[in-house]
Design a protein with these regions (language model features):
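Hydrophobic residues on the short alpha-helix immediately C-terminal to a glycine-rich phosphate/catalytic loop
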Residues: 38-42, 65, 69, 238, ...
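Walker A/P-loop NTP-binding motif
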Residues: 33-47
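A short beta-strand-to-loop transition that corresponds to the Sensor-1 phosphate-sensing loop
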Residues: 58-59, 89-92, 249-253, 259-264, ...
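Helicase P-loop NTPase motor core
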Residues: 23, 27-35, 276, 282-365
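Conserved P-loop NTPase-based nucleic-acid remodeling module centered on helicase motor cores
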Residues: 51-143
């Protein structure tokens, strides 16, 4: 077990609190380490492994959490039956408690979207671009809407329109003036997909909906939730309904799964339970120059006062100040020229190119 003095006062406060805790883990502050420590602490307090549920978003995150928990249990010399560990993704947790053997591939949804777009001539693109770009992005939109529990039988026009508008802000797939028309396409495609699905099986969003409909859902003493910023409304309801006490870790600034319904608004479902709120500020990954620059940048781009406060006091574990980052405003051709010049000077795997949308990747490539 890590010594108390090595954990830090912020983490220790979160670990020692007996009730529900909501941790804002800024990048590089060791959230997986903290979750694993919380698990070990609960076991040391006499909580049985079968009474603790751990939920995360991706299979990779699940494997990492499982690995960290096992390592720290061994380090703490805790004799625990590892077969009793309950570490799941949200979908694997739902599947484990449902008798749903016929899970369909996402390819069916893509096929239905493609056939509809071709038949109705919605876009004037060739097949290659439809298949590689438009269809996957429309699939993301469908998954996003369904993650809010929207189905053809439960279509709320106003709610669906509002969600489409929110999605449009982070995607250039839909022009504002086309939202009404697109809503009609969505309802038609959704209906066709549900009919096809009824013949072939259920999809992953159905797993969550069907799990929530169970009368006798499994109950635990504690639920540990990772990557809270990426949790959608259905997943938030599953986590909060699984135990009275939660230990949730996330960072609104790192929300990346908005297309699947992940929303910083779902933080509110957890804050309504009046947990202890703890902010982690000690960064073990970045230099102080990068932290100062990032804090200043994020503060200039957000109007949410609580999010701004989360950036106060970011401190590097590394004593080296490092090099101050620079922002250069330039046109596309100038940026491409700069990238090409850099590639000739350094190894290509030392350079990262990050853009806002998939269409921008196509332009740069």
């Amino acid at each position: 077990m890590i010594k108390k003095e090595d954990i830090g006062s912020e983490k220790q406060k979160a670990l020692d609190f007996k009730g529900s805790v909501l941790v804002t883990a800024n990048p590089g502050t060791g959230k997986t380490f903290l979750l694993a420590n919380k698990y070990v602490n609960l076991v040391k307090q006499g909580v049985l492994p079968e009474e603790i549920l751990c939920l995360t978003f991706t299979n990779k995150a699940k494997r990492e959490m499982e690995k960290r928990i096992i390592e720290q249990l061994k380090e703490a010399k805790s004799e625990v039956d590892l077969s009793k560990l309950n570490v799941y993704t949200f979908h694997s947790f739902a599947l484990d408690y449902l008798d749903e053997g016929n899970i369909i591939s996402t390819n069916l949804l893509r096929f239905v979207i493609y056939e509809y777009l071709k038949e109705k001539e919605v876009f004037s693109y060739g097949d290659a671009y439809l298949i590689s770009d438009i269809v996957p992005r429309m699939e993301n939109l469908m998954r996003y809407l369904k993650s809010y529990g929207i189905t053809p039988e439960k279509i709320s026009y106003d709610k669906t329109k509002k969600l489409l508008e929110e999605f449009e802000r982070s995607s250039d797939l839909i022009e504002k003036e086309d939202l009404e028309k697109f809503l009609g396409y969505f309802i038609e495609i959704f209906g066709l997909y549900e009919k096809e699905k009824a013949r072939k099986g259920i999809d992953y969003a159905d797993l969550l909906i069907n799990f929530l409909a169970l009368k006798n859902k499994p109950k635990f003493k504690f639920v540990l939730v990772d990557e809270l910023q990426d949790v959608n409304e259905l997943e938030a309801r599953i986590a909060l309904g699984s135990a009275k006490t939660f230990f949730a870790v996330g960072d609104k600034k790192q929300a990346i799964f908005g297309f699947q319904g992940g929303s910083i608004g779902n933080f509110k479902l957890f804050t309504e339970k009046k947990p202890l709120k703890q902010n982690l500020t000690l960064n073990r990954r970045s230099t102080q120059q990068i932290l100062d620059f990032s804090a200043e940048y994020f503060k200039s781009k957000t109007i949410d006062e609580e999010s701004k406060k989360e950036l106060d006091g970011l401190k590097s574990f590394n004593d080296s100040k490092g090099i101050k980052p620079k922002i250069i405003e330039a046109g596309r051709e100038e940026i491409i020229g700069k990238v090409c010049a850099l590639i000739n000077k350094i190894e290509s795997n030392d350079l990262a190119i990050i853009v806002r949308t998939n269409s921008q990747i196509m332009e740069i490539a």
